[in-house]
Amino acid sequence: KDFGSWKFCDEDDIRKVVGDNIGKIKISVMADAERTDYHEDILPKEDSVLDMIRVATYIHQIPTAIDMIKDASDKGYETTCNLMAISTVQEGQIRSALEALIETPVNTIYVVDSFGALYSEQVRDLTKMFLDYAKPAGKEVGIHTHNNQQLAYANTVEALIEGANRLDASLAGLGRGAGNCQTELLVGFLHNPKFKLRPLLQCIRDYIEPLREKLRWGYSIPYMLTGRLNLHPREAMKFMEETDAKDIVAFFDSIYEEE
């Protein structure tokens, strides 16, 4: 079995967790372009506990992503578009995608550092570019970072300072591979009294840390190397899953030979 139930986010599974009355909490799912039968898989909003559909797309999938956004919006959902692997895309292609996206009902457009390859000045420039298109169209800009080079938190803060106001984060950086920006770090930076750190730490202690013992995520040298080379982390993930994943020099040699 390659995937667990949360790969698919079936409505019944979600309801088992959140119930029917979830108050002010917003629930969202990620839908990958070209990897879902979204016309059938995504229910009308009135039949779902979901509030938001987050469409994840590579640059060559933009036409499909736009149709997914329109479909989800027509069904009553808030929508976002996550432009993945942005570190591999030429500026002209990014601008063309943004021009198309601002004509859709999408609420937020995300800068996504899928490979954990971006540095702060690149994040600033990309955030400014996204805002140049999104803000006049009445849309928000978000940031989604990966921690390959220990920059997920710092780059999220850079985007926030530039004007991004949708910040992706997870408790203890929980996420595939190198993980993501840590929620508990952001709470400290925001200095907003409505955000309480202690309940987050309690959740990390009770639920996230036990998971960490079973699932390996977070910064490691193999993920750092793929981030430096602006590569998909699949080779690092494969290496980390091996029984003797200690020869980091051999891994270095293997990926630099490929380069």
Where are each of the predicted segments found?
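Catalytic cores and adjacent flexible loops of soluble metabolic enzymes
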Residues: 1-259
